[in-house]
Every structure is written in structure tokens, then in C-alpha cells.
Amino acid sequence: MGKVQILAVLTIDGCLSSELYGKAHKDLRLDRCGLDEIRKNALYRVTPDYSISMLHEWREDGTNTCYLAEATPDTADYIYGLLRMQAVDEIILYTIPFIAGTGRHFFKSALYEKHWTLASLKSYPNGVCRSIYALDR
């Protein structure tokens, strides 16, 4: 079965991180936190150009293909749609030690109740934490 992953870099207050935060973002050296490895492990990078129904079909195709959708302020509505349509198997959250104060929150209201299992947790010397959650089936 294929797997749809969401990758999100969030501030402590739950806002999608963006390179707009400039120096604070660069000082964290996120390139040393395994982001590139996650991106390389995905066979397909999912963008808003892919329909959610197409992803549902791919998930059921019997392969172990990994589809990665990266949450950014620009793709937030699409990612929210994936979550609402229950098309996500795994959520990879990077939490950075920074409070944005304002911004685009990753999780919004009106999502279906779903139970997730913490599959992996890793902290990095720069204060970044990576949590990987797998959907309970």
C-alpha cells in the first residue's frame, strides 16, 4: 500500500515556518536535521496539482510508494484538504524553537477525530524536535 506523508516545519505556537523569518530560520541549520533525507525517500513530491482522489487511488495500488506533501504557507489549504479528506498516512512535524506570534497555523478546526501513534521522536542540538506520527488503522 502506498503511503502519503505530510512534512511540516512549525514554530512552537503551531505556525508554519517560513524562510521569511530570515536569520532565526537560517541559524537553526535545518539542513542538518534530516529534512533532505525525508525528501529524497519520497518517490513523488505531491503538490496542489495532484487531486486528492488521485492520491486515494495511489495509496491503494499495492506498492510501497511514498508520496510526500510539504506544508508551506502557500500549500496550507491543500494540506488541510488532504487531512480533511483523510488522505494522509503519516505526519512528520519539525518543531523549531521560535514563536512566530502570527502566521498561518498548520492545524485548523473542523478536522475529523483521528488517532495517531508516535512512531519516532528525535531532538537535535539546535533545539529542533522531529515527531513522526503514523495513522492508527
Q: Residue spans of the language-model regions?
A:
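Enzymes that bind and transform nitrogen-containing heteroaromatic metabolites
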Residues: 1-137
